[in-house]
C-alpha cells in the first residue's frame, strides 16, 4: 500500500467493546456518525454508554452523553451494576451527561423548523470537556412530533453533517421500525455506519445478536454475531479464523495415569491438542477426564471443567469412590466447574460463554463432559460447527481440550464413531468399551489414533478400584479378549501348565544327568583300558628295542673275537 492510499484510508475509532472491534476491523468510523438500531431491551443505550466509558478510561477520549429520555441520575444508576462509576467520570470531566427534555406537543412543524438550538447546546458540551466522542440516545424522541419526512430527512442530514464538522465520533441510537431498521426509515440512509442489535428467542432460549448492516469506506461481514451483557459490559463473540495456521507445541503432558502415559511412549498427550474419549455409559469417560484434570492442577495450571450432565458436587463425590479428591484444587481455584444444562443456552451463546471463561480464567485445559448432551441445543450440523469453532479457538490459544462422548450401539468393536461426527478433528482418540461375558461386565481401553506420536495398539483392561485406576494387559486368545475372571482363570491355568512343564523339564534333566553319569563311567573305563593297552605296547616296544641292541652287541663281540685269533 502506498503512502497516498494509506492517507486516504478510513481511520477507525476503537470502541473498547470486547469482540466488536474485531468484527469491524478496528472499530467505528472516526469523526463520523454511527447508527445503533434495534428493538427495546436489546442493549442500544448500553452499547453507546460503554463506547463513551471505554473511550474516556482506556483511550483518553472524553465523551458527551446526550439523553432525550432518561435523566442523568437514572443513567448513572442503570450502568452502576456494570461497575462503571459515571459520577466519578463526570467529576473528572471525562464524561458530560446532558438530559434534553423534548415534548412532542411543543414542536411546531413549520418550514423554518431546525435544530440550531440543539447544535448550540451540543457544541457547548463538546467544547467544555474537549469531547472526541458523543452519544445521542435516542433519535426518535427528537423527531417524534414530526410527520413530514422531508423535514425529518433534511434535519437528520444537518445533524449528521454538523457532527462530522465537529470531528467527533458519534453514536446515535434508534428504535427499530415495523418494516425498516428505524421508525422513520431514514436514519440508516444518512448514517455512515449502521449497527443492528436484535434479540431472538428460539426454543425458549433468548439470544442477543449484533450485525454490521452498513459501513461506508470499510469492508465488513454481514453475519450476525451473538453478544452477551456481562458484569463488565458487552462482549461480542469473536470471529474464529478458518485458516489453519495456529502454532503447535512439542511439549508432552501427563494423562494423570502412569500406565496410560506408557501407552503414549511414556510421555502422555501433546500440549494444546484435542483429545476425545468415547464409550457407552459407565465405561469410565469422566474418570479419565478427572485424572487428566488432576494432573493439570498438580502442575500448577488451571483447568476449566464444563459439565453438561452432573453437578460439581456429584462429580466430586463419585470420584472419591476411586480415591480421587478434587476438593484441594477447587479450594485453590486451579479447578473451576461450569455446570449447566444444554437447554440453558443455545450453541452460539454457549460458545460465547466458553470464550468468556477462557478470557477471564485463563485455563490450560478445558474439559467438556459429555459433549453428546449439546446435541439438544441444535441440530447435528450446528453442533458439529460449534465444536469445530470451539476446537479451533482453543488450539489458537494453545489450550488442551478434552472431550467425552457417549456412544450407543451393541457391545463390541462397532462403536468407533461419534454421533456429532467430530472424530476427524481430534488429535487423539481413546475408546472405552465394556465386555459382558459369563455374567461379568469388564471395561477395556484402547487408542484408536494419536497424531504425531508413537502409541500402543494393544487392548488394556481398565480397572477402577478404591485405589484409583489400573490398566492391565488383557489376555487375547483365538478371536476373543479375556478380561476379569476369565483373564484370571486363564492366567492361573497358564501358570499351572507352566508349572507342570517345569516339573517335567526338571525330571527330564535329572534323567539326563543320570544317563550322562553312566555314560561317563563307561567312557572312563574304556579310557583306562586304552591306557593299559598303551602301556603294554610301550613295554613290548621297549623289549624289542633291547632285544635288537643285545643282538647287535653280540654280533660285534663275535666279530671282534675272530679278529684277535687270526694268524699273521
UniProtKB/Swiss-Prot annotation:
<keyword id="KW-0418">Kinase</keyword>
<comment type="function">
    <text>Autophosphorylates independently of KaiA.</text>
</comment>
<dbReference type="GO" id="GO:0016301">
    <property type="term" value="F:kinase activity"/>
</dbReference>
<dbReference type="InterPro" id="IPR047221">
    <property type="entry name" value="KaiC_N"/>
</dbReference>
<dbReference type="InterPro" id="IPR027417">
    <property type="entry name" value="P-loop_NTPase"/>
</dbReference>
<dbReference type="InterPro" id="IPR014774">
    <property type="entry name" value="KaiC-like_dom"/>
</dbReference>
<keyword id="KW-0378">Hydrolase</keyword>
<dbReference type="InterPro" id="IPR030665">
    <property type="entry name" value="KaiC"/>
</dbReference>
<keyword id="KW-0808">Transferase</keyword>
<dbReference type="InterPro" id="IPR047222">
    <property type="entry name" value="KaiC_C"/>
</dbReference>
<feature type="domain" description="KaiC 1">
    <location>
        <begin position="11"/>
        <end position="250"/>
    </location>
</feature>
<dbReference type="GO" id="GO:0016887">
    <property type="term" value="F:ATP hydrolysis activity"/>
</dbReference>
<dbReference type="InterPro" id="IPR051347">
    <property type="entry name" value="Circadian_clock_KaiC-rel"/>
</dbReference>
<dbReference type="InterPro" id="IPR010624">
    <property type="entry name" value="KaiC_dom"/>
</dbReference>
<dbReference type="InterPro" id="IPR003593">
    <property type="entry name" value="AAA+_ATPase"/>
</dbReference>
<feature type="modified residue" description="Phosphoserine; by autocatalysis">
    <location>
        <position position="423"/>
    </location>
</feature>
<protein>
    <recommendedName>
        <fullName>Circadian clock protein KaiC2</fullName>
        <ecNumber>2.7.11.1</ecNumber>
        <ecNumber>3.6.4.-</ecNumber>
    </recommendedName>
</protein>
<keyword id="KW-0597">Phosphoprotein</keyword>
<dbReference type="Pfam" id="PF06745">
    <property type="entry name" value="ATPase"/>
</dbReference>
<dbReference type="GO" id="GO:0005524">
    <property type="term" value="F:ATP binding"/>
</dbReference>
<comment type="similarity">
    <text>Belongs to the KaiC family.</text>
</comment>
<feature type="domain" description="KaiC 2">
    <location>
        <begin position="251"/>
        <end position="485"/>
    </location>
</feature>
<comment type="subunit">
    <text>Multimerizes, probably forming homohexamers, no interaction with KaiC1 or KaiC3 is seen.</text>
</comment>
<feature type="modified residue" description="Phosphoserine; by autocatalysis">
    <location>
        <position position="424"/>
    </location>
</feature>
<keyword id="KW-0677">Repeat</keyword>
